[in-house]
């Protein structure tokens, strides 16, 4: 089956292209990026947000299926639908579990209400509206599916939340602070596992017309993840709980998803256990450390060790893991 990937970066798209090729499919990429998407993968060097470029790629290459990796605005969703309509047999639209927002009832399934677009962040609002465009087309009979992804991690991740913890370990920190006893559970997905899930969602017979959550099957608390990073780097440290209103880290919120539908319809299973995925990610980070300009949303200075030490001294409670 010929599959066109619409958009894509050097982080996620190559893993999807590799997975497609390994399953006997023929991937191609429409992207302005000059990244290497793999041996023998055709690249249409055009703007995937340009309707004429998308239509030209679809009509000239004649893919059987399309994976929309942009899917971040309702306008982009409509553009993609117009290119697909009557020209491809099925399409898959990669959304995000951010559309659910904070939800005290976990695990969150696909029937859960999404946020009201007018009350959501700009990013979540645009995703919600894009999903609504696709859902309306599905109701009209379009053979499409939506896949809601968690926070991705893995080699070549340009943001790489794990650097917050890895840098501390590599610099020999013997203490680390986590908010609220590190009890938060934030659903993550190792990039190779998620690429496998994408291909399953594209090819499974039951997928068209459906919405699926995807994520790792094994979940870590923030404290467990912090411990796992240290162990993977052969480092030891003491983990201290500090008040959450005083200290932020990546993954410091609870949001995890019900995967039963993906398991049943797509036969999804983690092919690589998260521990191994984390070790691969950290090995890459050791070879490709992030620069001094690395940042994370809502954290003013992620490596303010003086402040971290002061919080531990004043408020810290050592965790027994």
Report each predicted region and the residues it spans.
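Conserved beta-loop-beta element that borders a ligand/cofactor-binding pocket
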Residues: 131-156
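Conserved glycine-rich Rossmann-like NAD(P)H-binding loop of the short-chain dehydrogenase/reductase
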Residues: 26-32, 36
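Substrate-positioning beta->alpha
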Residues: 159-165, 178-202, 209-210, 224
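Mid/C-terminal beta-alpha module of Rossmann-like enzyme folds, strongest
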Residues: 200-259, 265, 292-296, 300-321
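N-terminal Rossmann NAD(P)H-binding glycine-rich loop of SDR-like oxidoreductase domains
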Residues: 3-23
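NAD(P)H-binding glycine-rich loop region in Rossmannoid oxidoreductase-like domains
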Residues: 34-38, 42-87, 99-100
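Non-catalytic, hydrophobic alpha-helical segments
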Residues: 12, 194, 198, 214, ...
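Active-site "gating" loop of Rossmann-like NAD(P)-dependent oxidoreductase/epimerase domains
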Residues: 96-125, 132, 136-140
């Amino acid at each position: 089956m010929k599959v066109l990937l619409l958009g894509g970066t050097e982080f996620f798209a190559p893993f999807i292209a590799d997975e497609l090729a390994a399953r006997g499919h023929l991937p191609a990429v429409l992207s302005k990026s000059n990244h290497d998407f793999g041996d023998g993968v055709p690249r249409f060097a055009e703007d995937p947000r340009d309707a004429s470029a998308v239509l030209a790629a679809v009509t000239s290459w004649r893919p059987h299926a399309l994976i929309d990796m942009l899917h971040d605005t309702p306008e982009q969703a409509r553009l993609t639908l117009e290119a697909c309509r009557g020209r491809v047999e099925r399409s898959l639209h990669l959304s995000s579990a951010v559309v659910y927002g904070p939800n005290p009832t976990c695990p969150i399934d696909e029937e859960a209400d999404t946020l009201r677009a007018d009350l959501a962040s700009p990013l979540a609002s645009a995703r919600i509206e894009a999903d609504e465009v696709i859902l309306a087309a599905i109701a009209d009979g379009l053979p499409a599916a939506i896949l809601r992804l968690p926070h991705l991690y893995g080699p070549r991740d340009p943001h790489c939340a794990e650097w917050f913890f890895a840098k501390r370990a590599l610099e020999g920190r013997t203490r680390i602070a986590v908010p609220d006893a590190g009890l938060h559970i934030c659903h993550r997905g190792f990039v190779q596992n998620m690429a496998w899930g994408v291909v399953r969602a594209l090819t499974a017979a039951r997928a068209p017309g459906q919405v699926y959550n995807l994520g790792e099957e094994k979940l870590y608390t923030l404290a467990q993840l912090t411990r796992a990073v240290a162990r993977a780097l052969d480092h030891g440290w003491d983990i201290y709980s500090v008040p959450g209103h005083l200290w932020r880290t990546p993954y410091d919120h609870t949001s995890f998803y019900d995967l039963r539908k993906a398991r049943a319809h797509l036969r999804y299973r983690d092919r690589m256990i998260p521990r191994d995925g984390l070790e691969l990610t950290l090995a890459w980070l050791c070879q490709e450390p992030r620069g001094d300009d690395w940042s994370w949303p809502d954290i003013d200075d992620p490596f303010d060790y003086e402040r971290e030490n002061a919080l531990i001294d004043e408020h810290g409670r050592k965790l027994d893991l």
